Design a protein with these regions (language model features):
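Small/aliphatic-rich secondary-structure junction motif
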Residues: 1-56, 134-137
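Short, flexible loop segments at the rims of nucleotide/cofactor-binding pockets, characterized by
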Residues: 11, 87-93, 117-120
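Gly/Ser-rich helix-loop-strand patches that form or flank binding pockets
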Residues: 19-27, 100-143
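General small-molecule cofactor/ligand-binding pocket signal
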Residues: 34-36, 86-90, 140
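A short acidic, glycine-rich active-site loop
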Residues: 55-69
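Structural beta-alpha unit
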Residues: 76-111
Length: 143
């Protein structure tokens, strides 16, 4: 029976259904739920060195704002359902993101992620595959 559940929340597409499902699973098992908003920087600063400072700062602020919105939505749902929870955000460059997410997912009894949608590509489409093959922990994929 899972005691600690993580839901990895995409910041660049709607996460309401994912949050609702994760809250329902956590409520079913009376588990602690961590909402982790994953914002990623697509630009590699070593490729576009001249413009990297300005672009990276803009991407960072946009990613943090999007993460804050998703985490607020998560907190409202978890409080409404009386689920013990924490909310976190992670912001990383794309080449280190897989390692970061995999290491974080190893700490939980169950990881809940959104299923990638090929008709609507997202920056976080790699999450499901990274957790499935890298964490060694159970994963629930929500369409």
């Amino acid at each position: 029976m899972p005691n600690d559940i993580a839901v990895l929340l995409p910041v660049d597409r709607p996460a309401g259904a994912l949050i609702d499902c994760a809250a329902a699973v956590a409520g079913l098992f009376e588990a602690h739920l961590d909402g982790i908003a994953c914002a990623y920087q697509a630009l590699n600063p070593m490729i576009a060195f001249e413009a990297s400072a300005v672009v990276m700062a803009a991407q960072y602020e946009t990613g943090q704002e999007q993460a804050a919105v998703v985490l607020d939505q998560f907190e409202i749902t978890a409080r409404r359902l009386n689920i013990p929870h924490d909310a976190k955000s992670t912001f990383n460059v794309s080449y280190a993101a897989t390692r970061t997410v995999t290491e974080m997912s190893r700490l939980y009894d169950l990881n809940i992620v959104a299923q990638p949608d090929s008709s609507n590509p997202s920056q976080t489409d790699f999450l499901a595959e990274a957790i499935l093959f890298g964490s060694g922990r159970p994963m629930l994929m929500i369409p």
